[in-house]
Amino acid sequence: MTEQSIDNILPSSEKNVKQWYVVHTASGAEKRIKEDMLRRIAKQKMTDFFEDILIPVFGVSEVKRGKNVKVEKKLMPSYILIKMNMTDKSWHLVKNIPGVTGFLGSKTTPKALTESEIQNIFNNLEAEAKETKNSKLYEVGEIVIVTDGPFETFTGTVEEIDQEKNRLKVSVSIFGKATPIELNFNQVKKND
C-alpha cells in the first residue's frame, strides 16, 4: 500500500470486524482465484481474518446438443465477495493474488459493503435462482419443429409440458388431422 496503511485508515470501531468487500478479478478467473486465495489463507495461517469467499452464481437450464443441461451463470462476472477483517496483512494477501485487479473503492482504501448492499446482492441471487427454476424451455402454444424420430421435420404446437420428465405433448398434422405425440425436449427445437 502507498503512504498510509489500512490499519491507520480504518476507524478503531471497524478494526477486528469482518465485513463484506468486493474484489475485482480477471475475467473468467474467479474460481481459480478463489482456490488460490483459500490455499494462501491456510498457508499463512490467516483463517481468523476471513469468514467467507463467495462467487455469486445461479443455475440455468440450457439445451446443448439436444440435451437439457444445468449451467452456472455468474451474477457479477469478474467479481468475488469476501467477508474479511481488513488489515494490512489481509489486504496484501488478497491484492497479491495473480488475477486480482483490486478492491471496490479507492486504490488505497477498500470500501466495505453496507448491510443493505450485501442483502440486495443475496436477494438478486435468490430471485435469479427462482426465476431460473420457474423458467421454461418451451411454452404451451409455442410452435416447435421435430428434429428426431419418425416425425422428424414436422412442425407442431406444444400442448403440454412435463418439466420433471423433460417431455412435451406436441400436436402435429398427420394427413390433415391434428395428432398429439409425446416427445423428449431433445427431440424438438424452437421454430425461430
Swiss-Prot record:
GO terms classed as biological process: DNA-templated transcription termination; regulation of DNA-templated transcription elongation; transcription antitermination; transcription elongation-coupled chromatin remodeling
Limits of the KOW domain: 140-168
InterPro entries: KOW, NGN, NGN-like_dom, NGN_dom_sf, NusG-like, Rib_uL2_dom2, Transcrpt_antiterm_NusG, Transcrpt_antiterm_NusG_bac_CS
Domain of life, per lineage: Bacteria
Signal recorded as keyword: no
Cellular component GO terms, alphabetical: cytosol
One Pfam family this sequence matches: NusG
Protein keywords: Transcription, Transcription antitermination, Transcription regulation, Transcription termination
CDD domains the UniProt entry points to: KOW_NusG (cd06091), NGN_Bact_1 (cd09891)
Keyword Cytoplasm: no
Homology family: Belongs to the NusG family.
Known role: Participates in transcription elongation, termination and antitermination.
PANTHER family for this protein: RHO-INTERACTING TRANSCRIPTION TERMINATION FACTOR NUSG, TRANSCRIPTION TERMINATION_ANTITERMINATION PROTEIN NUSG
Name of the protein described by the UniProt record: Transcription termination/antitermination protein NusG
Species the sequence originates in: Rickettsia felis (strain ATCC VR-1525 / URRWXCal2)
